[in-house]
Amino acid sequence: MRNIFLLMIFLSSVLAASAQGQVVQPKPTALVVSSRGELTDLEIGDQYDGEAPVTVRLYSNADEVEGYSLTCTWEFFKEGEEEPFLTRHDPDAEIEIRESGVTLIRPTIVYTSRTNSEIFWPFDSEVYEPFRIQLAESGIKVPNAFSPNGDGINDYFNVFDVKSIIEFHGAIYNRWGQQLFVWGLDEMGREGCGWDGTYNGRPVKAGVYYVVVIAKGADGIEYEFRRDVNLLRGYTEGGK
């Protein structure tokens, strides 16, 4: 009789287990999209190094399992701080990071049995290391000359050594204060973008022009440049 009773208990446990699906540990991933549209895939514990702003898309890769309720939590920390500045409760999430420094993104994934409320898989920080998003301090430089002669070198006037700039406005003027060209954040520092030394489609004369650049970095630093720029014609690299 005792053996029959034990067998019944065993069969009951097997039937209860079969009513629930099998839980497999998820492997969260992230996709970082830079302001230039560059894509970087991250696995758990990986670090991204780049410039602000970036968009981070987070994927828990956690499937719903029969017999369990699923809870996914994303906590966002600034490095060195104990309390998160943001918490999301979704299987997938997205955040734009516009501040320089290190942002830690820590996932927690929990499956809870609907039968006995037992937490089957507490995937906490000991299992999942945070994603590290490290964004450089801001910086920007403005040249004082360019040579739009079609040789592929310095053909456009634009800023350079750009790092973590989130606001930008640039303008070129002639000696009488007439505005000849303006450009913004989308063209800032990009190859093949900027002023090509023309106005209304026609080349302007060689000489001195005036540039105004106003920008703001992800670290809160504000930049303002007001200076002359020399437009050189008939000049090639090496002076030939």
How would you label these PLM feature ranges?
Residues V110-W121, K216-G220:
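Short, solvent-exposed loop/turn segments at the edges of extracellular beta-sandwich modules
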Residues M1-V24:
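Bacterial Sec-dependent N-terminal signal peptides
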Residues D63-Y68, V162-S164:
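Short glycine/proline-centered coil/turn motifs in the loop regions
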Residues F76, P91-E99, T103, Y111, ...:
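Residue-level recognition of secondary-structure-to-loop junctions
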Residues E66, T71-I95:
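Surface-exposed, flexible coil segments in extracellular/virion-facing regions
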Residues A17-E51, G239-K240:
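Sec-dependent signal peptide cleavage junction
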Residues G101-S113, Y210-A215:
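Append "Rare intracellular matches occur via the same short Y/T/C beta-strand/loop motifs
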Residues Y48, Y59, F131-K240:
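Short loop/turn motifs at secondary-structure boundaries
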